[in-house]
């Protein structure tokens, strides 16, 4: 499982520059996950990010699950604020994101073997 909270993360192609937080790191996360799923010892990879509903952006960001491939998915967790927030405001959303992630994981048939946290905000969530 990859945790990545900032920017507008969706299946490729990456929409570079639509926000200050949507850049090369989004491409890196998608590429890392797509390489990971190609391994013989990996059967499923999810990228967990923040779900939001904001007219300025693609409605896909409000979809709870987006399939990139048969075994590679983006899971979006809602937070208290339903709209897009930039990284400077993201800290206030971490408690509700963490709660949503714990709820999501408690409903999964299998827990992730590995959690890869991208950046400090995701690391704070992963530590719980």
Language model regions located:
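Short amphipathic alpha-helices and their capping/turn segments at secondary-structure boundaries
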Residues: 1, 126-128
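A conserved catalytic-core segment of Leloir-type glycosyltransferases
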Residues: 2-12, 22, 27, 31, ...
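Active-site-proximal flexible loops/turns
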Residues: 11, 120-125
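Intrinsically disordered, low-complexity cytosolic loops and termini enriched
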Residues: 15-16
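Short alpha-helical scaffold segments that flank and stabilize functional sites
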Residues: 36, 125-126
């Amino acid at each position: 499982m990859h945790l990545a909270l900032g920017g507008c993360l969706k299946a490729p192609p990456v929409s570079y520059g639509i926000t200050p937080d949507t850049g090369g790191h989004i491409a890196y996360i998608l590429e890392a996950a797509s390489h990971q799923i190609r391994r013989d010892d990996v059967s499923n990879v999810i990228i967990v990010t923040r779900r939001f509903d904001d007219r300025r952006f693609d409605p896909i960001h409000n979809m709870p699950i987006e399939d990139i491939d048969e075994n590679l998915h983006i899971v979006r967790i809602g937070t208290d604020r339903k709209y897009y927030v930039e990284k400077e405001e993201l800290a206030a959303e971490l408690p509700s994101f963490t709660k949503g992630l714990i709820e999501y994981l408690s409903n999964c048939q299998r827990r992730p073997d590995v959690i890869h946290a991208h950046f400090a905000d995701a690391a704070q969530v992963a530590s719980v």
